[in-house]
């Protein structure tokens, strides 16, 4: 009788063990580890109580137009970004552009969620040829996807994107130029 109970326990472990392991692996795939926040200067640190909920690598261009400033001098003025957003597995998840109505920076994901934001703070990039790192406050959310509860964005690890230092004068008024850039975007929402 003892031998039969021992065999039954061994059989149960042999059957149940792989099921438990499969369940554990399955939940690991559906609940990915939380994103770690980037190491940034205090000037663009996110407020307490927020946690990163999404990472995206953006690559594309910063678009500039040649405009006269208040002083009458012409300079390249940022029109907006035009970039593709990819996740850590290099899968395209959305796009980054300027909202056509507000002209504010906008992020739109393939899941239907989208946000617009306004820069709240910046620090110069390590490379003077690169656009600054930013802290962006979200001013509007739409859709029910990953961006639905996002309140803050950090743009970090920028490469390129500054306008050229030539080619903008009165004879080139309203001319447009694109400057290639890439950056990492971290999206933050209230901690759960």
Predicted regions and their residues:
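Bacterial N-terminal signal peptides
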Residues: 13-23
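N-terminal targeting leaders of exported, membrane, and organelle-targeted proteins
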Residues: 2-3, 26, 58
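Bacterial Sec-dependent signal peptides at the C-terminal "C-region" and cleavage site
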Residues: 22-32
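Bacterial N-terminal signal peptides that target proteins for export
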Residues: 2-14
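Primary mode marks residue(s) on the alpha4-beta5-alpha5 output face of response regulator receiver
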Residues: 31-62, 70-192
């Amino acid at each position: 009788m003892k031998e039969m109970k021992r065999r039954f326990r061994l059989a149960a472990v042999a059957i149940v063990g792989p099921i438990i392991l499969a369940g554990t692996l399955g939940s690991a795939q559906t609940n990915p580890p939380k994103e770690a926040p980037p190491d940034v200067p205090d000037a663009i640190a996110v407020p307490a109580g927020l946690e990163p909920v999404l990472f995206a690598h953006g690559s594309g261009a910063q678009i500039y137009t040649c405009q006269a400033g208040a002083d009458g001098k012409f300079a390249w003025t940022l029109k907006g970004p035009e970039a593709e957003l990819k996740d850590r597995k290099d899968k395209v998840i959305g796009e980054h552009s300027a909202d056509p109505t507000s002209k504010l920076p906008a992020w739109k994901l393939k899941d239907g969620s989208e946000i617009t934001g306004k820069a709240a703070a910046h620090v110069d990039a390590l490379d003077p040829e690169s656009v600054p790192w930013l802290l962006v406050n979200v001013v509007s959310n739409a859709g029910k996807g990953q961006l639905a509860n996002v309140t803050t964005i950090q743009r970090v690890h920028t490469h390129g994107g500054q306008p050229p230092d030539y080619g903008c004068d009165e004879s080139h008024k309203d001319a447009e130029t694109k400057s290639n850039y890439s950056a990492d975007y971290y999206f933050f929402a209230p901690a759960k």
